[in-house]
From Swiss-Prot:
SMART domains: Ribosomal_S6e. The gene is rps6e. PROSITE patterns: RIBOSOMAL_S6E (PS00578). It comes from Thermococcus kodakarensis (strain ATCC BAA-918 / JCM 12380 / KOD1). GO terms for biological process: translation. One of its GO terms (cellular component) is ribosome. This is Small ribosomal subunit protein eS6. Keywords: Ribonucleoprotein, Ribosomal protein. The lineage of its organism: Archaea, Methanobacteriati, Methanobacteriota, Thermococci, Thermococcales.
């Protein structure tokens, strides 16, 4: 059984809340990829209760990223639930210090697996 910390962002007001899920609800996330949308009710979440404002019951959550147990970020362009060392020039996992800089960095693939700890999501109305 997996346990995930979900960081759910509300793009309308810029507020983010952290929720922890485990058990069968968390198992529904395994195998999902960055960019996929999941109904909040499928994960057993009541968004109106979490955010303290009126959010439609049919709202979906879009996976935007996450990190694995060792802190390596997920990248949407690396396929599969694996960790890989790639040459980066920009994007998640690398912030260049000067123009044109490239560096090899370790990142996690775009698929959620049991070794993912944090999953970032945003509400899609």
């Amino acid at each position: 059984m997996a346990t995930f910390k979900l960081v759910i962002s509300n793009p309308k007001n810029g507020v983010a809340k952290q929720v922890e899920i485990s058990g069968p609800e968390a198992d529904k996330l395994i195998g999902r990829r960055i960019g996929e949308e999941i109904p909040a009710s499928e994960l057993g979440l009541n968004l109106s209760e979490i955010f303290g404002e009126e959010i439609p019951a049919d709202a979906k959550l879009k996976i935007t990223g996450g990190t694995d147990k060792d802190g390596f970020p997920m990248r949407p362009d690396v396929h599969g639930p694996r960790r890989v060392k790639i040459l980066l020039s920009r994007g998640p996992g690398f912030r260049p210090r000067e123009r044109g800089e490239r560096r090899k960095k370790t990142v996690h693939g775009n698929t959620i697996s049991p070794n993912i700890v944090q999953v970032n999501m945003k509400i899609v109305f």
